[in-house]
């Protein structure tokens, strides 16, 4: 039986290249549709594909044709209604389109072209041109650590790693292959010798010749070595990179009593989008979740998004905890440190200057990028204005934006993490 091994990268999906070419050609249409989908979807529902509609007029191929100017004289066979010199009116409406117009009895057109993009394609367009700013300290953590793992069988290796079973199996197969014809001749000679001894026991000449042939064949088979260097098989051990994280993102969320349920929902949606962005685009990043009201606490992902704990408001408690964790686990000399903070701006009045002091002296000199989003439809309060002073002192590594509704999340997110041009 014959086997066909398909080693093509696309496998059975032979249209992958054409699909990628199509996505590149209509990138602007798809990107616009993805942005509209993000604005109407729940952030929790981002990991799905999307149905894209492209106007029919935009998928027409360019062709060379005669212009509409000039004069033409055409004779139409069977023409009983018009005479030479009369003008033929254009067909009336009724062309194809979105389907919202009234019915027509003439004209033609083309419906919009609708197709589906996959989850991976949707996320690619969603996070296109986004990145963590100032990611520059990749080399400071030193060489990656490695772990030794089994990687199959090799023909060369350390004698201490010889695989006895595979070696003997290979030697046995080699002997069978190389002595197959000799063994077949030996069996025939042994049958012939048995026949001669029964039927012609006095034919000593032929019996002696057959016995000599048998001895010669046995000697040929025995000359083949039991074990050859070709048979040796070794367990292959390779070093697999076990990379350490190069970057850490601190997520600080205000869960105080001043945060309404709608405000908390917007904050959670923002952090879910951020978490999805980090996990998709960066394999080597750690995320630290900090919730705070009057006191701050480091929590896991589940508790960060779904805990119902609440209380008063002291924002500096979260900043102090972040600074402590940085000093203990993430030295700035080895890590790219990022932070995203979400709050409604309400804070104990005497605490806002403390926040600015902690940020400007203990955090901002060590982070690559710090972003603050304030979720409020009202006028800004003291915390916003204190943070504005931080932005003036650190214009390249600090950014702040305001969120009013859930529809602002994606545009603000793109504004905060838009890819910067190298300077």
From Swiss-Prot:
Biased composition (Gly residues): 92-107
Domain of life: Bacteria
A Pfam family annotated for this UniProt entry: DUF444
Annotated InterPro entries: UPF0229 (IPR006698), vWFA_dom_sf (IPR036465)
Region named Disordered: 85-107
Family: Belongs to the UPF0229 family.
Annotated protein name in UniProt: UPF0229 protein PputW619_4806
